[in-house]
Amino acid sequence: MKFGCFSSKFLPMIALRSLCLLTFLFFTAAPSHAAVAPDTHIHVIVSLVDNVAQGIVPVPAKIGNGDDPRSNLYWGAAYGVKTFLSKAEGWRKLGCENNINDIILERCQFAWKDKLTVTADAYRGSRIDQAMLDFMQEAANPPNAAEREMVAFIGHDGLMDEQNQPIIERFPKHAGHGKQAVVLACMSDEFFTGHLLAAGSKPVVTTFSFMAPEAYVLEAIARGFADQASEAELRSSAGIAYAKYQRISAKAGKAVFGVKNSN
């Protein structure tokens, strides 16, 4: 499905720009045969799309309610994080918890084979500022030496919106530590990479254009991370997955992802 900032085929560029759009790990016990590797983990912060609270070109009301993760485009819809990872080959949902607080409306944990766990948090759409701040704070937190950690943000690129600019003053600074970070949002290399570097983290997948931050891209990156893929391989996997679901060429898909503004 292509909505809003996700497809330049359907919206003019000016409209697209306006749209561009723990923590302790909770999980329900899996069966005894379903052991997972506790030392390889991704925390995904999902800012639910919100027709009212975000400065976007509205998507259909059913998938654009930022207070209802169940059918939200980035969470409960077909290519939303919860639905897609629950059904993708090799993945299983370990458990979910509703209403973590007034901002995090649902938290789910997933596992891919026995190699990786993913914790995904669905943030209320009107609190995209807090979602971005929490993402940056986690990116600034050095990884545990005994673990492999990645943090990812999925949603509208709130840093494009003037109303969210004050949150930048609260973004943390830290000496370099190399925690890998991913931002699946429109034009995220331009808007996030510099802040991630200042936070000490290592941006490995960001975007150069308007795009659909849907879960098939996250899924491809996660599998690569579990298999200890290089940064270039992670970006290539993201592009190939994007091309498949957007029905574009592999070359065009790969051109969406990269990190130009890194050291």
Predicted feature descriptions by range:
Residues A232-N263:
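Caspase-like cysteine protease fold
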Residues K82-G90, H156, A226, S230:
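Sec-exported extracytoplasmic/periplasmic mature domains
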Residues A15-T28:
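Bacterial N-terminal signal peptides
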Residues M1-I14:
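N-terminal secretory signal peptides that target proteins for export/translocation
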Residues W91-N98, T206-F208, E233-S237:
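Surface-exposed patches in mature extracellular/periplasmic domains of secreted proteins
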Residues S32-A34:
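Boundary at the C-terminal end of the N-terminal hydrophobic targeting segment
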Residues A145-G224:
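Catalytic cores of nucleophile-dependent amide-cleaving enzymes
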Residues P38-A140:
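A domain-level signal for caspase-like cysteine endopeptidase catalytic cores
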